[in-house]
């Protein structure tokens, strides 16, 4: 008996003088969980087992006394007993070794088969108490009727295939379990088919031989015969497999009808002899194999018994699967083991972690620590911007502050009182260089007289004498006299040292600079690099501050050292000033003059080109909608413009029809190059500023573009109808950018408008026309066309399509033109409304077809008289463009050798390969520019291919070969590309808004990062007792909060000291192994690598969980 009041199985078997297996068999019949002879059961369960075994022994005694009660039945059974014995003797040769444990009493079962089975009395106790003898006789008669061989014998291949011998025996075990079941339905249903004079199991296949497998032990059959004998109706269905079915023993077929579904073992022909009744009794075989006889009269209402509940193959799904596909599985293999695994998305794919916790990245460019150190350095050196008062007016008090900076001749001028001789003074002057560091610490009473006697040199050096005296502790009255004369002497000082003069001038210059210091809103970086001094001048800071900032970032620099663009951006960001590249600025500058000398005689007035610019969501497209009386903004993805839209609007001004060409540019920060191209070809820039938002970063960028293009600016203050709108505040912010309104005395036209309500739209257009009249815009329509490519894309039906803005001349269908390195012949032209044109004049935007490839947006085009001359120009440009493109690709992939090798050694060098396809060239530029801004310290983004057009099968093949992701922007997939992508498992993503595209790419880059391991606290326990077990020890603990889990991480603290960190290997409660113990309970804790427990120790339990890392700092 255990300490908790339970009884072991072997103790119970010893008390009952039985074998352990007999007690285990009884426990299993009673659904009492007992795995082995050492399992513990409660007293109530032990009493239940004892009662069951006593009842079983009584039944066997009663059955033996009734052996000779019915000679008629006995004579019938004798006829079938001999074949059974022969059968068993044949089977004994195939017995498995493990059958020996249960083969003690098989012989009595064969003998009891000769006993009469007809009496119904034993059935009442285990199966149903309500059955009468009349019902049982009816059952017997009904079961005896079907005498003929089963017509369903050819359907044997569709029957259930047992998995192994043990599973066949398990079917009989289930019958033994059902013998003690109180369900009446299991006994009453089989007689129902007798109404139609049909066999009880017409749908089941009836084997021609006994169903016992060849490996079934014979002794277990004898062991349980006494119990089977008292239940003849439940265990008799196997009798029906032979032709001798007239025997009155047929009532035993009541509950074992499912056994008729079991087929012969594959590969062995069925035996056609008379299978007797004696082999139907199930051996008491405890096994975990599935019970497959769940069909027949118990379909739908049967529940598997507790002994086989934990086996996954004991479910109805398992039986149905075997019926549909009679595939013999391996023993113990659960059905459905091979599950289809959905392929994970490539964009969210993570590499397997190679270590528990990756090292944290070292961020060199973090701006916070350098700023803190810079501030502390400013305090030490006294160079803070506020320290300008002691600089402008140097006073006599400044001289004593620097006694160390003395001229070489200042030392010997300190004369002692005994030096009255002029000759001694002269000798002292001659020896001054050798005795420069001579101690002159005695100041006598005759200093005043000496000062009056000496002239020139002594007067000039008096200030340094006084500074030395003031640097010492207070002196007698003579020092005070000297101090009083010091003021007079310093006022009379005629000249200062070179070092003092330089310092004074530097301090004055710094003070003056700090007095008028204003940080610029934005700095423009030229294409070449900047030196430290040039950057300091642009940022209006000292060069020492930039050197200091670079030093804290691990970069040693001098004032003449050149800095690359990334370093300049980092430093400028630290000082709060955005950086604009000069190449973007140059893109906005008008490079070519469209008018030639020959055009001056044929010039006419042309429509002005107006570019609408401004920050994102400030209402540019809505303003154009109000002008064109169209609804463009509502149809755009995300409500933002992502292309340059070119429109021509006809207005009535001063009773004349006037045309205006509008270019709508994107306001998103990614479309800087598009805005620059729009400014390059424009005549007037309309700057849209929201009255409720004010001047924003893209507003400043648009202003710089317009100034680079040298075009006039008209400001439209939009959204004046919204709450919180303040046009005056917008004018104030624009005045800080040197855009002063006319009503404030400036030259910039500012018009408050409301695009939604249409307020002041006519006034804005009138102002635009007035400004363009001053510009005197002219062009020559009688010449070959010249202009600029505004946008370009690849259409799957039309091929390469370019949006052209003709700036001079007339473009006609059939013209041969060269746009950068691309050759084209105009096959067709359409305007913004889709109307086909034969020719287009100056300032007219058209879409042209007929290019051999997609031209680059921003390139200038020119029409040539013949194709030969055009090809010559294009060939030279193509070679230059190839070299430039190759240089850009190499620069984008450039990684420092040291960082690359270090990352490769640590396995941290990760790459995300992308194939980018978009609708137009401008979108490609914008996305590539945005990808350059993503952090690339740990994950590199490699763009293998970027081109406008739809996704083709070639792109899919390239992605499959390189493991890349195809990213499409406002594009579609060609025919066959989708099928190829599915076949090669290539991830193809399509986006309509650039926000979402960049966000997903950043998430994919983060997915390649190894996750961080973070501690998650579980609970705490206090050690209250220690139990020694051999060489180790177990701590008896009380859970104070949370819980402790087995195999979790623990930290043992003794006071403030941590004495152990490791795994919790053993966790028990009341000598039972448990998975976890909650707060308020006691438990035993054991660690394999720690045994030095002490009372009062605190055990902290925690576990390590993974946390997704981000690219940000």
Curated annotation (Swiss-Prot):
Q: Where is the composition biased (Basic and acidic residues)?
A: 415-429
Q: Which GO terms describe its cellular component?
A: cytosol
Task: Kindly list the places in or outside the cell where this protein is found, as annotated in its UniProt entry.
Answer: Cytoplasm
- InterPro entries with a match to the protein in the record: EF-G-like_DII, IF2_II, IF2_N, P-loop_NTPase, Small_GTP-bd, T_Tr_GTP-bd_dom, TF_IF2_bacterial-like, TIF_IF2
Q: Which GO terms describe its molecular function?
A: GTP binding; GTPase activity; translation initiation factor activity
Region annotation Disordered: where it falls in the sequence: 56-446, 470-504
Q: Does the keyword Nucleotide-binding apply?
A: yes
Compositional bias of kind Low complexity: 248-265
Q: Where is this region: G2?
A: 639-643
Stretches of Basic residues bias are at 474-483, 490-504
- The tr-type G domain extends over 605-777
The protein in question is named: Translation initiation factor IF-2
* Region G3, annotated ranges: 664-667
State the similarity comment: Belongs to the TRAFAC class translation factor GTPase superfamily. Classic translation factor GTPase family. IF-2 subfamily.
> G4: where is this region?
718-721
UniProt main location, coarse: cytoplasm
What taxonomic ancestry is recorded? Bacteria, Bacillati, Cyanobacteriota, Cyanophyceae, Synechococcales
UniProt entry keywords in alphabetical sequence: Cytoplasm, GTP-binding, Initiation factor, Nucleotide-binding, Protein biosynthesis
Its biological purpose is as follows: One of the essential components for the initiation of protein synthesis. Protects formylmethionyl-tRNA from spontaneous hydrolysis and promotes its binding to the 30S ribosomal subunits. Also involved in the hydrolysis of GTP during the formation of the 70S ribosomal complex.
